[in-house]
Amino acid sequence: MSVDVKSDFSENESSSTPSPTTVPADVTWPHYPMMPFMQPHPLREKMLQPTFDPQIYGRWSQMGDTGFYGHPDLYPFGLPQLAANGQIPAVEAVDVKPPLSNGSSSSDSGMYPSPSDMMTPFPSTSSGAASSSELSAAAAAAANYQMRAATCYQQSVWPFMDYQQFQGFSWKMPLGNNHGKDRRSSSDGKTLPTGPGTNNVRVRTADKYRMVYSDYQRLELEKEFHTSPFITSDRKSQLSTMLSLTERQIKIWFQNRRAKDRRDKQKIRL
């Protein structure tokens, strides 16, 4: 009884164990194509020479400079004729000479222009002989062109560079400036009333020049300002007579001086 069970167990065990399967060597995998480097000869079809030639692919060629021309399959274009010793024969220089004249019967006479054609500016349009009037007209036109070119290039390319350097506004110029002298001379020519009753006399006219006070006038006005920032009408008339200024000029000077004093005090506070 036991023997039968053992035999049954051995049969079941042998049947449950899978037998190893052998994979043929030439099996193909359609979903996994073989990589290029796995092929036996991947680059043979792309090589210039299917067989290895040490004279062509060697690092140091043993056949000289002319050995490369010995392969017509590699150099099919313009191969020179090799001599028996493997050297390229020297080519004789060909001396090409231009024709002597236009009437020569040489086959290559049209390749080289004649000296007469080279002297003519436009061979296709110019006549054989130009008249003296045409030559004189051409000479006059050339002279006129040269004169106009010289006149043009004498001038500056940038017009603003031809003007004098800007020195500033005329009403800010010192006494030595010519523009300020002209404007002051025009204003000095006018006799302005001074003294009492000149509070409404306008000195600035259409010229819009700025009044330039002398050192003496500025000194006296500064002394008066330090005495009192606000000038009275009596003192204003006295200064007008003494400084040869109108009362309006003195009033405006004091207004500007008080504004300057306020700005200076604000700067000190900051």
Curated annotation (Swiss-Prot):
Tell me the keywords, alphabetical order. Answer: Activator, Centromere, Chromosome, Developmental protein, DNA-binding, Homeobox, Kinetochore, Nucleus, Transcription, Transcription regulation
Q: Return the InterPro entries for the record.
A: Caudal_homeobox, HD, Homeobox_CS, Homeodomain-like_sf
- Alphabetized SMART domains for the sequence: HOX (SM00389)
If researchers knock out this gene, what phenotype do they report? Answer: Embryos shows disorganization of cell types and lack specification. Loss of V6 rays development in male tail. C and D blastomere derived muscle.
Up-regulation conditions: By heat shock.
Q: Which molecular function terms from Gene Ontology are attached?
A: DNA-binding transcription factor activity, RNA polymerase II-specific; RNA polymerase II transcription regulatory region sequence-specific DNA binding
The lineage's top-level taxon is: Eukaryota
Q: In which tissues is it expressed?
A: Blastomeres. Embryo. Oocytes.
* Cellular component GO terms, alphabetical: condensed nuclear chromosome; kinetochore; nucleus
Q: Where is this region: Disordered?
A: 1-24, 96-130, 175-201
Q: Which GO terms describe its biological process?
A: ectodermal cell fate commitment; embryo development ending in birth or egg hatching; embryonic pattern specification; muscle cell fate commitment; positive regulation of apoptotic process; positive regulation of miRNA transcription; positive regulation of transcription by RNA polymerase II
Task: Specify where it is mainly localized.
Answer: nucleus
| Location of the DNA-binding region in this protein | 206-265
From start to end residue, where is composition biased (Low complexity)? Answer: 14-24, 101-130
Q: Which Pfam families match?
A: Homeodomain
- Indicate where this protein resides in the cell: Nucleus; Chromosome, Centromere, Kinetochore; Chromosome
Known PANTHER family for this protein? HOMEOBOX PROTEIN CDX, HOMEOTIC PROTEIN CAUDAL
Q: Which family does it belong to?
A: Belongs to the Caudal homeobox family.
The miscellaneous remark of the record is: Fifth intron is thought to contain a regulatory element required for expression in postembryonic neuroblast V6 cells. 3'-UTR thought to inhibit self-translation in anterior blastomeres.
What does this protein do, in the record's words? Transcriptional activator. Interacts with promoter regions for tbx-8.9, tbx-9, elt-1, hnd-1, scrt-1, and vab-7 genes. Binds the sequence ATTTATGAC. Binds to the enhancer region of the hlh-1 gene promoter during embryonic body wall muscle development. Activates the gene for mab-5 in embryo development. Necessary for vab-7 expression in C blastomeres in the posterior of embryos. Required for posterior V6 neuroectoblast cell fate specification during postembryonic neurogenesis (patterning) which generates the characteristic ray lineage during male tail development.
The annotated subunit structure for this chain is: Interacts with tir-1 and let-756.
Supply the name of the protein. Answer: Homeobox protein pal-1
Please state the gene responsible for encoding this protein.
Answer: pal-1
